[in-house]
Regions:
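Hinge-like oligomerization/junction regions that interrupt long coiled-coil arms in large cytoskeletal
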Residues: 1-163
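Extended alpha-helical coiled-coil "stalk/arm" regions
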Residues: 156-198
Length: 198
């Protein structure tokens, strides 16, 4: 049965959640099948591509990952677990080369490294991963719960903004009433009143 990688993983140290989510980025959504089903899945994917129904989805060839049974010490792969040997091997391959650094000044000591707050160093370039990539979690069984809580918070924030906007509109409507006039003689008086309404 095809599975999405992020649903098969758990992060064991929340300090490094953002780094794992951010570094994997779109790879979190790659599809994983058992090695014996890869060719069939690839054929289906190719058919969908020809029909212009699927693009940009990664299909992991799990049969080629035998050498990645162990997560290298100090690597980002050490904080990710999976019940699937194939998912764990893939994570070991991708995150096993990424060294965890607690401070930014340690980054350049390794070819590929990352801090908990997502400052990444790779190919002799330091860069910050955009927060929108990792702010919403997708990895692990609690990811949907966190997404739901984030959605509720966003709804609450939007409702508060809506109330604030309505209050401002009401205030503006009152102010505009004072600007309406029939004769030019009222202009000076009304401008004085408007300034007092602030």
């Amino acid at each position: 049965k095809p599975r999405i990688l992020c649903e098969m993983l758990e992060i064991t140290d929340e300090t490094w959640r953002n780094a794992v989510e951010g570094y994997l980025n779109t790879q979190r959504f790659y599809v994983l099948v058992e090695p014996e089903h890869f060719d069939i899945a690839l054929g289906i994917y190719e058919k969908l591509r020809r029909e212009k129904k699927a693009y940009g989805v990664g299909l992991i060839n799990s049969g080629k990952l035998e050498e990645y049974d162990i997560a290298p010490a100090g690597s980002l792969a050490t904080v990710v677990e999976s019940k699937s040997i194939y998912a764990k091997r893939y994570v070991n391959m991708v995150l096993g080369k990424v060294h965890m650094c607690k401070r930014v000044d340690e980054l350049k000591q390794y070819p590929v490294s990352i801090t908990p707050n997502c400052m990444r160093y790779q190919n002799h370039v330091a860069s910050a991963i955009r927060p929108e990539i990792y702010t919403t979690p997708f990895i692990g069984k609690n990811a949907f719960k966190v997404q739901y809580e984030q959605a509720l918070q966003k709804k609450e924030d939007l409702n508060r903004q809506k109330i604030e906007c309505k209050d401002r509109m009401t205030h503006m409507e009152v102010t505009l009433q004072w600007l309406e006039w029939d004769d030019d003689t009222d202009v000076k008086y009304r401008i004085t009143i408007v300034s007092e309404l602030k």
